[in-house]
Amino acid sequence: MPAKQSRSTAESRTAPHSYRERVNSTVELAALVYRPLTASGALLSILRGKLYRRRSVRNVLDVVAVHSISGGQGHSAESKVRVEYLAPAEGNANGNSISNIGAAPCADIQGSSDIAATGNSLSTPAQPALLEGRCKMCLLDPTVLKATELWPDPASAAQHRVPVFSLGAAIAGSHVTQQLEAALQAGQLSRKAADLLQQLHERLSRGPSSVSLTEDRDGSEQPQGSPRAAAAPPPPSSKRRASYTGAVEVTFTPRAVELNYQAYTMSELLSMVLPLREHADLVALSGFEQVGHIAHVNLSAAHLPYADIIGQVILDCNETVSVVVNKVDAISSVFREFKMDIIGLRCRTDGVDGNAVAGADLDEFGEAGGSLTAAERQAIALEALSPTYSLAEARIHRLLTATVRQHGCSFRVPYNRVYWNSRLSFEHTRLVDRMGPGDMLFDVMAGVGPFAVPAAKKGVQVFANDLNPVAAQYMKVNAELNHLPANSLRVFNMDGRDFLNSVLFDSVTRAADAPFPGHLCTGRRHVTMNLPAIAVEFLDVFQPLSSTCASASGQQCNASAAAIVNERWNHLPAHVDPNAIDRCTLFHVYCFSAAEDLITDAVRQVEVNLGYTLPPENIEETLMVRDVAPTKRMMCVSFTLPPAFWENLLASRPGQGEEPRGAHAETASTLVEEEEVEQAAKKAKTDKM
């Protein structure tokens, strides 16, 4: 299904790049500056969970403290951010100072030398050193301490500077208390900031083995010995923080941080740029499906005027995405692909005219690096022979062909021309894990091979079919891409009923003399029918002849036309050895259900389309695969054909002296009534996507 490069609507669209300027802002944070650098391990461990966290914003910075009285000597740029704070004057223990110090980014200061650390000594130094030289600056989360909370009176903050304090095991607790109280009395520090410094001092003084506070998993602090703290010991593999027993010089300063669009998550950006409060119908996007480099969204009518902005936000926040598409209509095609619009495109290669950016090395097919397989080149060459072929459409096809990894396999997915659902990855793995070497897999609706390719890679002999010729071609591409052994995956392009009536019939009954030479089933045969909207309807090929008057659509049909559908499984050739028939073939059929009893409803859908009741011993497993909608579930029924079916098939063999039992009335325990078949067909039609 062709994808459009852009939408033509009556509504005007906002320029996609304009949102970036709209989210620019500046936030002022409280920052803790400390030295020596050797105390970083201990301090950062204590501050874990308390630092400012924002994308693309460093919360721990290297800075160099210099005397303000130097007049900025040695700084080449007048626009440098300078933070000023007080250093304790000589002989003044309370921290009041007559000397100012400034801090500038470390990378911008040349020739600065570190002041010698106070050392790992337990004795209190005679006089703390000035906070000068290389330091660390930690940006604090506003929930811990705001910039406006550094001083008691935020209105007079411009006239205040925070003193330098000496903390740690080398400083007596009484001295620290004296420093903090003096700063509080002088209005140079708020009580909240003083409490934080007091906590830092206590944690540094006691060391890692006797810390009085322990962090919970959510970053909150719990008293030592509390039930939550005692119940959550550190994991054995975690590293204990290094202790630091020297003095640490610290101070606070406000720090202005400029935030641009790179600082926000995708959901935050969308909430900021979309007028959610102005339009009740406009809700925040919950996410998107990613298929290789393609992001797929389902936009409502209210979102469409902002489609380009949404596409650009997704590109900006997800480096692995280069194309964003919007699903335009519901899936209605017989091939199960859907119409889509391209609403976001990363500037690498123009998807329409093929103009590449500088330095891009594209081959004649428009593929970077010449990574196409021989089968894929053949598929593209065949497309070029079509009377409706156009270069623009071919470029779109290449742009929307993704490479996906699942089960340790690589899949080339022409996303705009086949059906692919990444949410079924777990189900693909679950089913393939049930198979092994010697088994056979008959995949009736195989797509590009999410079941078939990994099964073949495990040594399973695979016969895979899809009605979509593009899907069938790309199964061959994926077989080559994953270096599958020759003939391990045989690909068919036919209707699913024809596949069941020919390939599966010949294999199960051995009706044909060596239909596939060299393929011998020493394990179990599996049949997958993963098209939940209509897969159960294909089971009508197994119905007894008396049940063929109701078509799959619930409308009465011509008896001779209906007989064609299930004639093969009601007439066993005379040369077939009944003992050679494989009656253990396991079917895995998918369907949708909105019933309260999901399991019963799923089994009943199988029975009414099959035309037989399934005894409990024939139902190996029934499970819910995933939620499709609030009241709709995807189900999988794994079963073998019941004894009544095989009795009916054997009775149809020429020379048995009786007609197929399905041609006559049968008990309700064996055959499902035709009226139920018609009702189930109507229900299945309602459940379609």
Swiss-Prot record:
GO annotations of cellular component type: mitochondrial matrix; nucleus
Which GO terms label this protein's molecular function in UniProt?
A: tRNA (guanine(37)-N1)-methyltransferase activity
Task: Please name one Pfam family that this protein belongs to.
Answer: TYW2_N_2
* Amino-acid positions noted as binding S-adenosyl-L-methionine in the UniProt annotation, renumbered to this chain: 428, 466-467, 495-496, 530
Q: Principal localization?
A: mitochondrion
State the top-level EC class.
transferase
Question: Can you tell which superkingdom this protein's organism belongs to?
Answer: Eukaryota
Q: What is this protein called?
A: tRNA (guanine(37)-N(1))-methyltransferase
Q: Can you supply a Gene Ontology BP term from the record?
A: tRNA N1-guanine methylation
Listed under catalytic activity are: guanosine(37) in tRNA + S-adenosyl-L-methionine = N(1)-methylguanosine(37) in tRNA + S-adenosyl-L-homocysteine + H(+)
Q: Which family does it belong to?
A: Belongs to the class I-like SAM-binding methyltransferase superfamily. TRM5/TYW2 family.
The EC number(s) given in the record are: 2.1.1.228
Biased amino acid composition, Polar residues:
1-12
How the protein assembles, per its UniProt entry? Answer: Monomer.
Q: What does this protein do?
A: Specifically methylates the N1 position of guanosine-37 in various cytoplasmic and mitochondrial tRNAs. Methylation is not dependent on the nature of the nucleoside 5' of the target nucleoside. This is the first step in the biosynthesis of wybutosine (yW), a modified base adjacent to the anticodon of tRNAs and required for accurate decoding.
Q: Where is the composition biased (Basic and acidic residues)?
A: 679-689
Respond yes or no to whether keyword Methyltransferase is given for this record: yes
In its keyword annotation, does this UniProt entry include Transferase? Answer: yes
The UniProt entry, under InterPro entries, shows: MeTrfase_TRM5/TYW2, SAM-dependent_MTases_sf, TRM5-TYW2-like_MTfase, TRM5/TYW2-like_N, tRNA_Gua_MeTrfase_euk
**Where can this protein be found?**
Mitochondrion matrix; Nucleus; Cytoplasm
